[in-house]
Amino acid sequence: MEKFFNIKKSGKIYLQLYSQLKEKIEKEKIKGKLTPVRKFAEELEISPSTVAKAYDELERNGYVTKKEGSGVYVKFQKKKNVYLEDHMESETFRYGYFNPEFNIDFASATPNETVLPMESLKRAINFVLDRDRESAFLYEDPQGYFYLRKTICKKLKKEENIDIEVKNIQIVSGAQQGIDIISEAFLYPNDIVIVEDPTYRGARNSFKKNDCKIMEVSMQKDGFSVRELEKILKRKKIKLFYTMPNFQNPTGISMSFEKKIKLLELAEKYDFYILEDDGLSNLYFDKNKPETLKSLDKNNRVIYIKSYSKIFMPGLRLAYITIPDILLDTILARKFSSDIYHSGLNQRAFQYLLENGDWDIHMEKARNIFKEKQKIMYNSLKKIKDISLKKPKGGLCFWVKLPENVSSKAVYINMLSHGVGILPGVVFSEKKDNYIRISFAQCEEKNIEEGVKLLGCAIEKLK
């Protein structure tokens, strides 16, 4: 079997072997019993412990099963097209989240191109090419460019008072990949994951694909319902609580300081982890940035995902995860088998932007732009009768409650006929058909009032 493997004697050899075995199992090139550890090690001229570690990783991720006294066997692989399933399951795609034909786009929460710092990025890329030349295009460390991870650690210490080592930072291709990797590395079938209701569907789909049991706690004006969470914790053993504590998607709600502390206390008491998804805490409109859960975490209960690309340059797909020591190897293995590593050029350019302050300059500019857009949209929405909404202290969206007899799907269809994109509440919760999410991220300031007027007309017509 050794002729089918290309093992380089550098880097983490067991990860190379794991990745190649995984691929061959998925393509059904390997079936039945795997080659015994010692024999396989001799064939590949590597140590038996390396083969054993690769087999352990295959078992951990559900590709093989070990039979006492018999050997290691490939499990039956249920065929599925992940991308197709995502598209079919996600209301996001059904309701045209990525429709390029909207005249006024209130659906997308991605900033439009006028906000993106093109000149800063061009300078950074040119600097990196002059400094690193061919090195910028070589294979990168699967865990991420070392100096980017080092710069992230420095910023976490300076801005959040978080002490973390470089080895505990994993660079990923966007927050969604981070969620997927954590799901695959940390969660087993039938593990219980708690999510807020409503919440980001991409996270729900990720947990669902890993056959987890999903339970919900409702959102209140200051974050999740403590009473509902404690009720679950007293009767169930949960593995993970997924949350966006600052400017939550879709509600825009920020968890109160008291609830952040309470959640951390409950995680310690009931022995579960918190997955904090932070894409927007830098987009605050008050004087002070809200605290992250990770900055308050004294017992290493928070796995923190920070997305940079969301409000900087969406196409970069750049985020990082802070990883507890216990998960280091499994998360690195999942990243390696997913796409091996993130673009070295992108990582080096972004490290330069972080180091020289361009990121901070961009964020200050973005806060000013979006604060003004939020103000215009809020003042326009207040003119619509029989809806209710709160004004978030940051972020990119409003969560609007419709009149009781008006369906968000009907509003969506009506608005679509006028070339205006919104997202119906069912994208985020099956229970929220009388809510819509509208975002001011993508639309031009001059179009906000017109789009909101059309929304008001649609609601009035459907009442």
Q: What is each PLM-predicted segment?
A:
Residues 1-126, 336-342, 403, 409-417, ...:
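N-terminal basic, amphipathic alpha-helical segments
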Residues 136-270, 282-283, 288-296, 370, ...:
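Conserved core of the PLP fold type I
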Residues 298-368:
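Conserved core segment of the aminotransferase class I/II
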Residues 44, 210, 236, 269-270, ...:
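Helix C-cap/helix->beta junction micro-motif
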Residues 368-378, 388-401:
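Conserved glycine-rich beta-strand-loop-beta hairpin in the small C-terminal domain of fold type I
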Residues 41, 323, 399-404, 422-460:
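Conserved PLP-binding active-site segment of the aspartate aminotransferase-like
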